[in-house]
């Protein structure tokens, strides 16, 4: 019985502990935040008051401020003009008056600011330094021609008449600009003296994009023109022509110009499709000499159509209907001689 009661109470106690844990955590976090805010309020010095030394300060010593740190030096200072009568303004000794020499105030007299605001101001200061430097370089490159004025790095005569504070800021910017020029080396000096605007002006004005020679048109095939052009050996020829001499017709493959379309003879003036060596033959004539009739395949002209004898006027030595293949003696009757030449064909 007691075991059952203990088993039922254990989950209940665990549930109560889980419900109380968030409240305990919230209380502990709130106490820590209050302590941190109190420590920050006591550690930050007020304007015109020295830092109080007490047990809280001894327990949490303040870090010493480095006057050479870039972040603190780049924080914009809130300068206030001194009154003309020399008396301090309203507020008593809480507001410190600037000395007549316009020097920087002491570190202890700076007003307390939020660290996030200080970081944002430092970032804006860096961005403002980078942008005017580039803009000044571009404006000097456009406005000043080579040899017409001083370089961007040289000091202008207006800088001599500036106030001491402005001169200090100018020296600070010059000291920050020196490492960049040293890292660039001789190339940086060349770029600063002769900016790359000449190359852009050679490409952009008065001639198409991509050409570096303004006197030559784009795509003309000569030197200095655009890519992808192939010069033609004979520009006066017609498109598709393959002959070396210009002026021939399209598709002419003769060695000499003036022939008709499709003529493959060596000499011009022949008819279409003539394959004879000499002109004047009829269409389809394949004899060696002109003058033969159509279909004549004899060696000498004058024979009739279908004549297959070597010489004209010679009859067939065999009777009609006798088959005699060339170069063989089968199917030939007895008593007949073999043909005199193996070149004879069927009758």
UniProtKB/Swiss-Prot annotation:
Pfam assignment, any one: STG
Database matches in InterPro entries: C6orf15
Residue stretches of biased makeup (Low complexity): 148-157
Ranges of Polar residues composition bias in the record: 41-60
Recorded GO CC terms: extracellular matrix; extracellular region
Biological process (GO), any one: extracellular matrix organization
Subcellular location field: Secreted, Extracellular space, Extracellular matrix
Keywords linked to the UniProt accession: Extracellular matrix, Secreted, Signal
Region (Disordered): 41-110, 148-189
Signal peptide per UniProt: 1-26
Subunit annotation: Binds to numerous extracellular matrix proteins.
Name recorded for this polypeptide: Uncharacterized protein C6orf15 homolog
Organism name: Pan troglodytes
Name of the encoding gene: STG
């Amino acid at each position: 019985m007691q075991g059952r009661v203990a088993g039922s109470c254990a989950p209940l106690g665990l549930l109560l502990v889980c419900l109380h844990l968030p409240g305990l955590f919230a209380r502990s976090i709130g106490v820590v935040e209050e302590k941190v805010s109190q420590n920050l309020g006591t550690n930050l010095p007020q304007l015109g008051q020295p830092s109080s030394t007490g047990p809280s300060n001894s327990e949490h010593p303040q870090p010493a401020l480095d006057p050479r740190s870039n972040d603190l030096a780049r924080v914009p200072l809130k300068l206030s003009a001194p009154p003309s009568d020399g008396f301090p303004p309203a507020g008593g000794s809480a507001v410190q008056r600037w000395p007549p020499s316009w020097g920087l105030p002491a570190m202890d007299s700076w007003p307390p600011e939020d660290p996030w605001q200080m970081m944002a101001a430092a970032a804006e200061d860096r961005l403002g330094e980078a942008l005017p430097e580039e803009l000044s370089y571009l404006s000097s490159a456009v406005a000043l021609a080579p040899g017409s004025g001083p370089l961007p790095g040289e000091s202008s005569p207006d800088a001599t008449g500036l106030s001491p504070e402005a001169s200090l800021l100018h020296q600070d910017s010059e000291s920050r600009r020196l490492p960049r020029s040293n890292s660039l080396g001789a190339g940086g000096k060349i770029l600063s003296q002769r900016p790359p605007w000449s190359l852009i002006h050679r490409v952009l004005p008065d001639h198409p994009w991509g050409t570096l020679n303004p006197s030559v048109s784009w795509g003309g095939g000569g030197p200095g023109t655009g890519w992808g052009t192939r010069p033609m050996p004979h520009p006066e020829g017609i498109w598709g022509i393959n002959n070396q001499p210009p002026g021939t017709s399209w598709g002419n493959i003769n060695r000499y110009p003036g022939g008709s379309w499709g003529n493959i003879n060596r000499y011009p003036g022949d008819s279409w499709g003539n394959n004879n060596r000499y002109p004047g033959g009829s269409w389809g004539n394949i004899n060696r000499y002109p003058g033969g009739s159509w279909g004549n395949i004899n060696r000498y002209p004058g024979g009739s159509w279908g004549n297959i004898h070597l010489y004209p006027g010679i009859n067939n030595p065999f009777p009609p209907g006798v088959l005699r293949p060339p170069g063989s003696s089968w199917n030939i009757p007895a008593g007949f001689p073999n043909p005199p030449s193996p070149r004879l064909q069927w009758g």
